[in-house]
Amino acid sequence: MIASNVNALVIAPADSKALVPVLKKATDAGIKVVNIDNQLDVDVLKSKNLQIPFVGPDNRKGAKLVGDYLAKKLTAGDEVGIIEGVSTTNNAQQRTAGFKDAMDEAKMKVVSTQSGNWEIDKGNAVASAMLNEYPNLKALLAGNDSMALGAVSAVRAAGKAGKVMVVGYDNINAIKPMLKDGRVLATADQYAAKQAVFGIEAALKLVKGEKVDTNDKGVIETPVQLVTQP
């Protein structure tokens, strides 16, 4: 992209740290960069003296909305497990933090937090292991809906359907039937399409030499909403 002499890059990085040196080269070459979806690591950006605007939701807030809703269905002291995304990514870390905020506030016991790598199969394996190790588990909080799908299968295979609640994040199409029939209690919609639109709009402004409207943390915050049974 840098060699192609583009004017701007809108990037949703899989890793919050790995691409920062490349983006430093891009900005040094005069290319405007906007970060969407998964926020680049703030400390790594600072180490490269980079200021890259981020367009995306408050993942921690979104996960807390989901966790708060789940907590209303639980009893203080209940055991829960968290299936995290890729642990090195900012959005995974923030969602886990939001889940823990809600569980701590409601006095639930988080007995395990393990990475499911955002994947159905890995989420299933992690959920199965948790259900086996913690027979009193009452809920599984998955950092995305793909892992929630895997968790639902694990709950069914363990013979605990209706006894262990599952929540997710993203509101993908595949999760909607499960919300409807109760296999998944709740998820969060972060309107990914809006992130892309806002990201492109911000990039175009920067190319024109205009300022983008960010908060004091350099963020253009996009909506995130709790989604429950229709």
What residue ranges belong to the model's regions?
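Hydrophobic alpha-helical
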Residues: 7-28, 99, 111-112, 116-177
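Short beta-strand segments enriched in small/hydrophobic residues
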Residues: 8, 13, 52-53, 79-86
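Flexible loop/hinge segments that line or gate small-molecule binding clefts
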Residues: 22-61, 72, 79, 172-180, ...
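Short, solvent-exposed amphipathic alpha-helices that sit
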Residues: 62-66, 90-109, 122, 126, ...
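Hinge/cleft segment of the Venus flytrap/periplasmic-binding protein
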Residues: 83-87, 91, 101-103, 194-230
